[in-house]
Each structure stands twice: as structure tokens, then as C-alpha cells.
Amino acid sequence: MLKQIRPAIVMIVFFTVLTGLVYPLGMTGIAQALFPRQANGSLIEKDGKVIGSELIGQAFASDKYFHGRPSAAGNGYDAGASGGSNLGPTNPKLIERIKGGAEKLKAENPNQPVPMDLVTTSGSGLDPQISPEAAYFQVPRVAKARGIDEAKVKALVDGQVEGRELGFMGEPVVNVLALNLALDAAK
């Protein structure tokens, strides 16, 4: 019987070592060698201190900053609680949350339609980007809070718009953290 079980045990140990150690360590080594910034989380540093990642959204509450999408991930962009709200399109809680968010934003900028991504969460709840329309919608509030010309703020948004991936996939987006850092740098 041991003769029959031995090949199975050898294969289990072999593939456990291959897929559990060799492959992950090999891929980590290749990623660190070829793409070190991305392999380490695409972290953004300011004055030698990590302030965020290009890949994870952050909550910005001040009117002096652009705000990202609402987060369904725990208590405000908690990466450990990543996930959608799982509320269906007819769920009263979802409808009420969207209406409340839209009313608040409409009061802030009554002459513009509220972009959907400013009132709806993403699948992960952690998206770092918003649409250019959502960024332009916030320009008057940010310019007023900072006491600077709207045209200057709009130009900063224009400079932060990232086009479609490979020229045809997805939609143009604006990374909120990068935009807010550019805003701070422009003063």
C-alpha cells in the first residue's frame, strides 16, 4: 500500500513547494527587479514620509481638497474591509444614501448635474480615481475654499486627467490623491 501512496505524497509535497514557495518567491523577485515601485504598492511619498498609494483611495473631508468616491470599505477607505456595499439597486438604504449625497452636492454646485461617481461606491470601495466630470464639478468649491481662481484649479484638473488604458480601454480618470498633491504644490 505504501508503494501506491508514495507517488501521491511526493507529488503533493513537490507541488506544494513549487506553487507555495518557488513560484511566489520567483514572481516577487522578478517584480522587485523589473517593477520595484509597483511591486511595493505604488506608494507616494512627501518629505520622506509615505502619504498614500496611487492604487487606494483616501478620504478628504476639507473643502480645500477634491473628494473621491464614497467608500463602502469599512469606516472610510479601510483596505482591510474592502468590498462593495452589496446593496441592490432597489434597496431603500442605497436609494436614500444616493439621494442624500446628491442633495448635498447639488447645494454645493446647483447649476451642474451631479456626476454619478460622486454618489455611488465602486465594487472595491477603494477606487483612487474619479471621472474628469466629477473633478470639474468640484472646481468651484475647491477654488472658493482656497481663495484662488477657478481657471487655475481647472487647469490643474486638466493636467491630471489620465487617458484610456492603451488608448481604448476604460474611461479617462483623475487620481484624487495626485490631484490634491498638485493642488498643494501649486498653492
Curated annotation (Swiss-Prot):
Predominant location: membrane
Protein name: Potassium-transporting ATPase KdpC subunit
Function in brief: Part of the high-affinity ATP-driven potassium transport (or Kdp) system, which catalyzes the hydrolysis of ATP coupled with the electrogenic transport of potassium into the cytoplasm. This subunit acts as a catalytic chaperone that increases the ATP-binding affinity of the ATP-hydrolyzing subunit KdpB by the formation of a transient KdpB/KdpC/ATP ternary complex.
InterPro entries: KdpC
Record-annotated membrane-spanning stretches: 7-27
Keywords: ATP-binding, Cell inner membrane, Cell membrane, Ion transport, Membrane, Nucleotide-binding, Potassium, Potassium transport, Transmembrane, Transmembrane helix, Transport
HAMAP family in alphabetical order: KdpC
Gene Ontology annotations for the cellular component aspect, listed alphabetically: plasma membrane
NCBIfam families: kdpC, PRK00315.1
SUBUNIT field: The system is composed of three essential subunits: KdpA, KdpB and KdpC.
Membrane-protein topology: Single-pass membrane protein
Family matches, as PANTHER family: POTASSIUM-TRANSPORTING ATPASE C CHAIN, POTASSIUM-TRANSPORTING ATPASE KDPC SUBUNIT
Recorded family membership: Belongs to the KdpC family.
Keyword Transmembrane helix set for record: yes
Molecular function, one GO term: P-type potassium transmembrane transporter activity
Subcellular location: Cell inner membrane
